[in-house]
Every structure is written in structure tokens, then in C-alpha cells.
């Protein structure tokens, strides 16, 4: 930049360790630790002004150094052939050294930021678990995830600690028939807590959904899915939206080259989906506009 070439050559030993313990057939425990370099984007190093979008300006910091992260994880997996039970659990922890953080300022709706190597330690803890079992032609699954993050933010020249905790629980039941219709019932429950010092927010999301597919007369394939999502904003208000799609395909037989399909999207003609969330410097609402009810006819030829 400006007819000046910058090179940064360095030598650093980064440990990487993994061990696996086979507890018994189909059951294992794996421990992993590694230290990694984290390099930033070149736009954060540029000497000048970067326009991210209409209300966000960014100034580069050419003296930035790479950051380091310590990462440790423990995984447990088990599969039982006798009762068709599958269990998987993963716990992970990471912390950052000299993490690259932004110095953010707001003037009305205009956001300006520059960057520096922070001496404050940021941490992240995550836990994921899945238990799955098959009962004949029915498969039951429950997924659980918990994530905690601690981030030091710098807004309007002041340092503050941002803590976030997200919990998600998703039970599901699905059939697995070869000829008969199959149905999947799922329920997602999520709680997001965010503490930005003098401001605390809690979002509770509930989302039941159903998927259905059927193979009819060995010629027609019918598929449909429906979901309903509601989000509690924590202040007595809530928002909700739903979505429904369906399709019907025809193929004369399994060896036929041609397939004909009619597909309908957004059958309920929903205008938009509204979601609320929070990051390390703000709480925001995002609205995704959805294409109106849309029906297509498709012709598929298999070579």
C-alpha cells in the first residue's frame, strides 16, 4: 500500500495434541488440545477508510498483530447395535490471547470502528449432546446445545463485559417406512440471554414443525413441510410467523427418464419473518421479506 511492501515472517511452535480411548466396542472418548494463530482480514490492516455499508465506516490499523487461541475439547460417542442407541457428546473451551477487537463509536445511526490487540481475555464454552434410538420403524432423537461466551467490548471509548448464554433443546420423532408414508415431528425450544452491562435481554423461541412425505401408487411422490415459530421478547411482547410448502411429483416407473413436478412455496402467503437477536455491541431486530406464494411446474429428465 502506498508503494510500500510489508512482510511479517515469524517462527512459532504451536502444540497440537489428541488422544483417543476406546472404552469398548462402539464406545470411545477423545481429548484434543491445540493452540492456533488467528490472522485478521487485510481490510483491518489497510491505512485508510473502508465503507462497509451505508452507515458503517472502518479505519484500518496497520500495527495489528496476530492473536493466539487455546482450544480444548472432549468428545464421547457410543453406538449400541443391540438396542440401536446412538449417543454423542462434545464439550469445548477456548480462550483468546491478544484478541483483535474493535473500538466502536456511534454518531446517531453512523457507526465507525477501528481495531487493536486487546489484553482482555475472551472465553467461550460450548456443550452439545445428541441421543438417538430406533424402535422398529420409529426413530426418536433429542439434540441439546449450550453455549456461553464472554467478550470484552469497547463502545464510545468505554470497556464493558458482554456475556451471552444460549440454550437449545430439540426433540424429534420420525418414522422410517419403505412403502408407507413417513412423518417427522420436531419441536425446537431456545433461550438466549445477553448481558451487556447495564442492559439485559432474554429471547425465548418456540418452533414446532412437521415434515410429511408419501410414495403413492409407485408413481407419485408427495412432500409437505410446515413450521410455526414464536419468539417471546421478554417484555410481555411476542412475534410469530409460519411457513408451509408442498410438492407433488410424478414418475411413470423407477426407470423412467422423465419426472413432472408441481411445487408450491409459501402457501400461506406470509410477507416477512421477523427475528430478534443480540451481538457483542447491540440488540437488533431483523426482518426477512419472503417471496409471495409461488407455484412452479418442473420437468426433469434424467440422463
Where are these regions (language model features)?
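Exposed, low-structure sequence patches enriched in small/polar residues
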Residues: 1-303
Amino acid at each position: 500500500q502506498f508503494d510500500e511492501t510489508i512482510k511479517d515472517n515469524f517462527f512459532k511452535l504451536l502444540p497440537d495434541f489428541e488422544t483417543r480411548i476406546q472404552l469398548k466396542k462402539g464406545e470411545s472418548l477423545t481429548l484434543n488440545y491445540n493452540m492456533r494463530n488467528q490472522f485478521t482480514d487485510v481490510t483491518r490492516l489497510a491505512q485508510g477508510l473502508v465503507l462497509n455499508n451505508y452507515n458503517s465506516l472502518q479505519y484500518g490499523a496497520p500495527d495489528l498483530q496476530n492473536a493466539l487461541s487455546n482450544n480444548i475439547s472432549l468428545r464421547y460417542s457410543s453406538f449400541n447395535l443391540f438396542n440401536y442407541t446412538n449417543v454423542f457428546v462434545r464439550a469445548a473451551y477456548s480462550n483468546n490471547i491478544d484478541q483483535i477487537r474493535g473500538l466502536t463509536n456511534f454518531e446517531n445511526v453512523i457507526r465507525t470502528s477501528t481495531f487493536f490487540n486487546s489484553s482482555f481475555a475472551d472465553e467461550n464454552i460450548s456443550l452439545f449432546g445428541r441421543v438417538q434410538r430406533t424402535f422398529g420403524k420409529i426413530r426418536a432423537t433429542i439434540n441439546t446445545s449450550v453455549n456461553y461466551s464472554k467478550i470484552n467490548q469497547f463502545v464510545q471509548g468505554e470497556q464493558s463485559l458482554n456475556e451471552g448464554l444460549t440454550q437449545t433443546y430439540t426433540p424429534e420423532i420420525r418414522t422410517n417406512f419403505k412403502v408407507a408414508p413417513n412423518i417427522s415431528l420436531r419441536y425446537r425450544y431456545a433461550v438466549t440471554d445477553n448481558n451487556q452491562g447495564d442492559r439485559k435481554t432474554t429471547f425465548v423461541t418456540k418452533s414446532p414443525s412437521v415434515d410429511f412425505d408419501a410414495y403413492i401408487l409407485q408413481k407419485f411422490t408427495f412432500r409437505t413441510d410446515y413450521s410455526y415459530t414464536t419468539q417471546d421478547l421478554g417484555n410481555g411482547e411476542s412475534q410469530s410467523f409460519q411457513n408451509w410448502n408442498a410438492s407433488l411429483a410424478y414418475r411413470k416407473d423407477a426407470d423412467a427418464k422423465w419426472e413432472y413436478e408441481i411445487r408450491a412455496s409459501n402457501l400461506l402467503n406470509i410477507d416477512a419473518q421477523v427475528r430478534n437477536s443480540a451481538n457483542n455491541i447491540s440488540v437488533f431486530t431483523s426482518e426477512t421479506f419472503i417471496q409471495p406464494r409461488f407455484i412452479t411446474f418442473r420437468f426433469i429428465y434424467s440422463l
